[in-house]
A protein has these predicted regions:
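Acidic, carboxylate-rich catalytic segments that either coordinate divalent cations
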Residues: 244-268
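A basic- and aromatic-enriched beta-loop-alpha substructure that forms the phosphate/nucleotide-
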Residues: 67-144
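Helical scaffold of the NTase/Pol beta-like nucleotidyltransferase catalytic core
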Residues: 1-36
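Short loop/turn segments at secondary-structure transitions that flank enzyme active sites
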Residues: 60-63, 100-103, 147, 172-173
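Conserved NTP-donor binding/palm subdomain of two-metal-ion nucleotidyltransferases/polymerases, i.e.
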Residues: 20, 30, 95, 260-261
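Catalytic metal-binding acidic patch
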Residues: 39-80
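Conserved nucleotidyltransferase catalytic core and NTase-mimicking acidic/glycine-rich helix/loop elements
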Residues: 122-250
Length: 268
C-alpha cells in the first residue's frame, strides 16, 4: 500500500505567486534565482486551509555587495490571503549550505517549484550533497520531532497534524541513520522506505487522509500505533560515532557565488 500525497497548487495561485515574485524583483532590485513551496504543501499533506509557504533565493546587482557595512539579507512579505512569501539572499543561502542547513536543502528538493534559473539551481543542487552533514541533519530532525511530541501530543485529544510534524522529522533522522544521505522532502517518499509495518502504514494513511480533508486546527483522539512508534523511536535514539560531518569545498561556493552575482541576466 502506497502512502497518500498531494501537492495542490491551482493555476490561479501559481499565477499570483509568479506575480508576487516579479513585484519583489522590481521593488527590491533583485533577481529571483529559485522559488519553491515549503511546508505541508511541499511535504505532500496540506489541509484545505493550509497557507502557501513560498520560499525563494535571490541575488542583488554586483554593486550591492561592495558596501562596507552588512546589509539586510532576507526579504519578508506580510502574509496576505494565504500567501506566506519570504526569501534569502544568495550569499546567506550559500553560507547556510556550507553549514548544511536542512531548511535550505529541503527547499532545493521541493516537488513544487514556481521559478528557477536552470543553470544556477542545477549547480546549487549539485553542491548541496557535498556539504550535507549527517550529524547536523540528524540533530535538527530529532530535535524537531522531540519538541513537537512533547509540546503537542501528550493529551488524550491531540492536534492531529502534529503527528505528521513528528513523524516526518523522525523518519528523516532514521533515513540518515540508514546511510541514505539527504532525506527526501515528500513525506510519502520518506515513509514508503522507512515504514515497513503494514498496520502502522495503514494508520499513517488514515491520518494523512484526515489531515488532507480537515482544517489545520483539527483535534482528535490519539492514533495508538503511531503514538507507540514515536515513543519507542525517540527513546531508542543514540548517536553513532561515525557520522559524516560534510566535507564540501568552500572554494566551489565562492566560485559559484561570483559567477552568479556577475551574470549578465539581471532584469533592467
Amino acid at each position: 500500500m502506497s502512502f497518500l500525497y498531494a501537492h495542490p497548487v491551482s493555476a490561479d495561485i501559481r499565477a499570483r505567486v509568479l506575480s508576487e515574485l516579479a513585484d519583489i524583483e522590481r521593488r527590491h532590485d533583485v533577481r529571483v534565482l529559485f522559488a519553491c513551496e515549503s511546508g505541508s504543501r511541499g511535504w505532500g499533506f496540506a489541509s484545505p486551509d493550509s497557507d502557501y509557504d513560498v520560499r525563494f533565493v535571490y541575488v542583488h546587482r554586483p554593486a550591492w555587495y561592495l558596501s562596507v557595512e552588512p546589509q539586510r539579507d532576507v526579504i519578508e512579505v506580510p502574509i496576505s490571503d494565504e500567501l506566506d512569501v519570504g526569501g534569502w539572499e544568495l550569499r546567506k543561502a550559500l553560507q547556510l549550505m556550507h553549514r548544511s542547513n536542512p531548511t535550505l536543502l529541503e527547499w532545493l528538493a521541493s516537488p513544487i517549484v514556481y521559478r528557477e534559473d536552470p543553470a544556477a539551481v542545477q549547480r546549487m543542487r549539485a553542491l548541496a550533497p557535498t556539504f550535507f552533514s549527517e550529524r547536523r541533519g540528524r540533530w535538527h530532525y530529532l530535535s524537531m520531532a522531540a519538541k513537537n511530541f512533547r509540546g503537542y501530543l501528550q493529551g488524550e485529544s491531540v492536534r492531529l497534524k502534529k503527528y505528521l510534524y513528528v513523524l516526518r522529522p523522525l523518519l528523516a533522522a532514521q533515513w540518515i541513520d540508514a546511510g541514505r544521505g539527504m532525506p527526501p522532502m515528500r513525506f510519502a517518499d520518506l515513509a514508503d522506505v522507512m515504514v515497513a509495518d503494514a498496520p502502522l502504514r495503514e494508520e499513517i494513511n488514515r491520518l494523512l487522509a484526515i489531515k488532507m480533508a480537515s482544517s489545520e486546527a483539527e483535534y482528535g483522539a490519539r492514533f495508538p500505533r503511531i503514538h507507540a512508534f514515536v515513543e519507542q523511536a525517540l527513546a531508542a535514539q543514540a548517536l553513532p560515532a561515525d557520522f559524516r560531518q560534510g566535507g564540501g569545498d568552500p572554494a566551489a561556493l565562492d566560485a559559484f557565488f561570483y559567477a552568479t552575482v556577475m551574470a549578465d541576466s539581471h532584469p533592467s
